[in-house]
Regions:
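A conserved ligand/cofactor-binding region detector
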Residues: 1-273
């Protein structure tokens, strides 16, 4: 797995970044033989599952599941943390939250988000089925917590996977709604991601029919177009999708939740009190 951090230094007023190789071949993150296919822009990559043991309560052990690509190549990094952001198979997990000052960087963020969402959703469904779930009862076996909007595609992606298992769209939406909850951490724009439809269509064309249907469904619940999943400019509001299609929305503290209810997300609160 590749380094996800950088060391920042300054010399003569110039900031420089160097990779911090904190994650090495001797890491506690153990590779497994489990891989999940993930379609990125019509091209399939294989996300390998890594497991990291985490000390738990009363001597018990929890497991943190991580994913990476075998094709990642750190040698493409030059001049600190510069690399070709379009060479997805080599750079996808090199750096978390890469520079998004250009279109390539913004697309890379969506690629990163979908890799983790798709692989994670496939793992959740597989583990729940192994424990006896028939997927119709997924909410009895799993709880998916959406922290901010970075993993918001964990709503349409499980719907897609459930449809592949023969479950009708309307039921798949209800299953995902019952399984997912959303926590809003801040009202700042960077935590309320909005992606152009054209960007998502490049990265996850397989999700676009589902997102379109979710927007249609949300519009049947309210005449307030400000609450739509897709706005009049063709931008997809990830937080709106989260609120419409999860069973619970909260802030990180009681005061924050009250602010969301009374001001920032008041329209949604009136729709879903």
């Amino acid at each position: 797995m590749a380094s996800a951090c950088a060391i920042t230094t300054a010399s003569q007023g110039v900031q420089r970044e160097e990779p911090d190789p904190w994650l090495t071949d001797h890491s506690w993150a153990e590779p497994t033989d489990t891989v999940f296919p993930v379609s990125l822009g019509g091209h399939t990559v294989n996300a390998r599952l890594y497991r990291l043991a985490v000390t738990g309560y009363e001597g018990r052990t929890n497991t943190l599941n991580l994913f990476d690509l075998d094709t990642i190549d750190e040698s493409i990094v030059t001049e600190g943390i510069r690399f070709d952001k379009t060479d997805i198979e080599k750079c996808l997990t090199l750096f978390l939250y890469p520079d998004d000052s250009d279109e390539a960087g913004r697309l890379l963020r969506i690629y990163q988000q979908y890799l983790m969402v798709s692989a994670g959703a496939q793992l959740i469904l597989a583990e729940c089925q192994a424990r006896g779930s028939n997927l119709h009862d997924l909410a009895d076996y799993a709880a998916i917590q959406i922290n901010d909007t970075h993993p918001s595609m964990v709503i349409p992606e499980p719907i897609r996977l459930l449809e592949e298992q023969g479950i009708a769209f309307d039921e798949a939406v209800q299953i995902v709604t019952d399984t997912c909850a959303y926590t809003n951490h801040t009202i700042l724009a960077e935590a309320l991601e909005t992606w152009p439809w054209s960007y998502l269509e490049k990265v996850v064309p397989q999700l676009m029919p589902i997102i379109g249907k979710l927007d249609d469904l949300a519009r049947t619940r309210t005449d307030d177009t400000r609450l739509a999943v897709v706005d009049e400019h063709g931008n997809v509001h990830m937080a709106h999708m989260d609120i419409h299609f999860t069973h619970s929305t909260n802030g990180v503290a009681a005061l924050h939740t009250e602010i969301l209810k009374n001001t920032e997300l008041n329209g949604f609160y009136r729709l879903y009190p």
